[in-house]
Every structure is written in structure tokens, then in C-alpha cells.
Design a protein with these regions (language model features):
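Generic preference for hydrophobic/aromatic residues in regular secondary structure cores
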Residues: 10-11, 46-48, 160, 204-206
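Short loop/turn motifs at secondary-structure junctions
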Residues: 8, 72-73, 156, 202
């Protein structure tokens, strides 16, 4: 009520996050869509959008894609290439994995052409602790953006929205990232790589989202926030 009807907020997007242990899921896909539909019905207009969270590589994940297209009718898709955002996952994956992901893109594009969910996939990238090379050993590479260019080139009808703009710091002051920025002459780990993709690879379907990273730095380090 306060967020949508007593504030200047005009639109919101309800999302979720997957975990290797399903009991940890923040919201399940049916809950996301039910909440979206309730808010929009109450408002009498579209005030909330909703994701379907997909889990590439896990059993039955493409069945959930089919169910979402036919039943849930989300506004777009959400996933985590690192698999599990809080601990090393058994199910990391890459956007440019032709065998795993390209059949999904094909379904997503076809559904969008037929009036279904937008051909937009929102991907969690970045947001790892300072010791990520050890605490996420073997999987941290999946939180970087080196898998974005080929997927974007091969699927121009898909929109790739990279959440957090792949900024590395998570639940910490961005001082370390700022120092790296100054010492490198203007490079922000992974976020700069993302920003370079459209011009470097000639694509127009890659976007950076800044919600959490803005919140993490706007007050604590406004100079870094402005540059990022």
C-alpha cells in the first residue's frame, strides 16, 4: 500500500532468487505471479511486473519454462549464472552455452513474438565478497560478464539485462573498488567490462541495472556511485 499507492512509485518489479536448496527460495514463481496479478487487479492498471526465475542445468528446468509461457505468463525472465548467490553452487552455467541456453532463447523469442513474455532475461552478475576467489572457488568466474558478448550477438532479439551492472562489491563499503578504480586509471572490476560490450561487439541488446549497487554506494561513497 505505502509503496504503490501512497508514494511516487509508479511501477515495481517483483523478482526472486534460486538456491541449490529449494527451501531457501525467497519467492517461488507462482507466488511472484499471484502477487503481481493481485496488485494490478487492485490498482485497475499495470503497476507491478513479475519474473519467472529459471534454473538452467537443474532437473526439469525447461519444463518450468514451458509452464511459465503457458500458465504463469511472466513479464520477463530472471536467473543467476553463478547458480546460488550465497554459496558455491552445483549448477553454475554460462549465457553462451549453446547446448544448454540456446534452446531456451529460441523458446523465449518465439513466445515473445506470439504475445508471451518479453524476450528479456535479467541476469544476476557480480556482488561477491572480497575473498571471492577462495570463498567461491571454481564458480566465481560465472559471475563475470565474459559470457555476455557471444550470447548477445547470436540472439539479437533477446535483451540481456545484467543486474547490479556486474559490480563486484557485496555488503561492504565500495572503498576497495574505488581504490582499484583510481590505481587502474578508471577500471571498475566487471562493470567496466560490461559497459564496453555494446561498442566492442556491436550489440544493442545488453543493459546494466544499478539498483543494489546504487544503494550500496550512493551514501557511503557518492563519488564512486557517480562514476559507476
Amino acid at each position: 500500500d505505502h509503496q504503490l499507492y501512497r508514494s511516487d512509485t509508479k511501477m515495481s518489479l517483483l523478482s526472486g532468487a534460486p538456491f541449490d536448496d529449494p527451501s531457501w527460495w525467497l519467492l517461488h514463481n507462482d507466488q511472484i505471479v499471484a502477487a503481481r496479478d493481485m496488485v494490478n487487479d487492485f490498482a485497475g492498471s499495470q503497476r507491478m511486473l513479475g519474473h519467472t526465475v529459471i534454473t538452467p542445468g537443474q532437473d526439469g528446468w525447461m519444463d518450468e519454462v514451458d509452464r511459465a509461457i503457458e500458465v504463469l505468463k511472466p513479464d520477463s525472465w530472471k536467473s543467476y549464472t553463478i547458480g546460488d548467490p550465497l554459496s558455491p553452487s552445483k549448477y553454475p552455467w554460462r549465457l553462451d552455452d549453446e547446448e544448454l541456453m540456446y534452446p531456451f532463447y529460441e523458446k523465449a523469442v518465439k513466445a515473445a513474438r506470439n504475445g508471451g513474455p518479453k524476450a528479456t532475461i535479467c541476469i544476476h552478475k557480480g556482488l561477491l565478497p572480497p575473498d571471492y576467489e577462495t570463498s567461491f572457488k571454481g564458480v566465481w568466474q560465472y559471475a563475470t560478464v565474459d559470457d555476455v558478448p557471444k550470447a548477445a550477438q547470436d540472439w539479437p532479439e533477446m535483451n540481456f539485462v545484467i543486474y547490479h551492472s556486474a559490480l563486484r562489491p557485496f555488503l561492504e563499503l565500495p572503498d576497495q573498488a574505488w581504490n582499484e578504480f583510481e590505481e587502474s586509471g578508471g577500471y571498475i572490476k566487471w562493470a567496466s567490462d560490461l559497459a564496453a560490450i555494446p561498442e566492442k561487439y556491436g550489440v544493442t541488446n545488453v543493459y546494466g541495472e544499478i539498483g543494489s549497487t546504487f544503494a550500496n554506494s550512493a551514501v557511503a561513497h557518492p563519488r564512486f556511485c557517480a562514476i559507476h
